[in-house]
Regions:
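Nucleic acid-binding interface residues in structured DNA/RNA-binding domains
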Residues: 2-159
Length: 159
């Protein structure tokens, strides 16, 4: 996100944007990719509420949060683009608050990847995760990415 210091992320977090809502998709490739046509859109605050549930020493992926919302709401899947945006909004909103912190650093991208769009970037997320006992590994030579080693073993079960 750009110009984070000029944005009110807490206002964005509480703007439901006419969500929750459902949409039926008709594109056959998307239906095959996501396993159905019923797509759920969760509001930003719902991502924040789920992210707050992740305890010290545990992690979650955005994909697992999306699966949880779909299952909870009788959808085939949760829309992926807004999911990524809303997770970032929750992170920045927490960063802007002086209380009621959301432990956003525990929410990872696919395959346990760290999220460079969080406040402080990769380095800040890496520092916080390592402080909770996680090992961070680097992958790639030119397009370097960072991951929580064996993240599957410390995934939090939302159910």
């Amino acid at each position: 996100m750009a110009n984070e210091d000029k944005k009110d992320f807490n206002a964005m977090l509480h703007d439901s944007k006419d969500m929750p809502k459902f949409q039926t998709i008709t594109d056959q490739k998307s239906i095959e990719k996501y396993g159905g046509s019923r797509m759920y859109f969760a509001p930003p605050i719902d991502y924040d509420k789920v992210m707050k549930r992740i305890p010290y020493g545990k992690v979650i992926t955005v994909g697992k949060i999306r699966e949880y919302f779909a299952e909870l709401n009788g959808a085939d899947f949760t829309e992926p683009i807004t999911a990524g945006i809303f997770v970032s909004i929750a992170a920045w909103a927490s960063y802007q608050r002086s209380e009621d912190e959301t432990p956003y650093w525990r929410t990872l991208k696919a395959n346990g990847e760290l999220n460079k769009k969080y406040p402080g970037g990769i380095e800040a997320q890496k520092e916080r995760l390592e402080a909770e006992g996680h090992t961070i590994i680097q992958k790639g030579r030119t397009n370097i990415k960072y991951f929580v080693k064996d993240y599957e073993s410390v995934l939090f079960d939302l159910r």
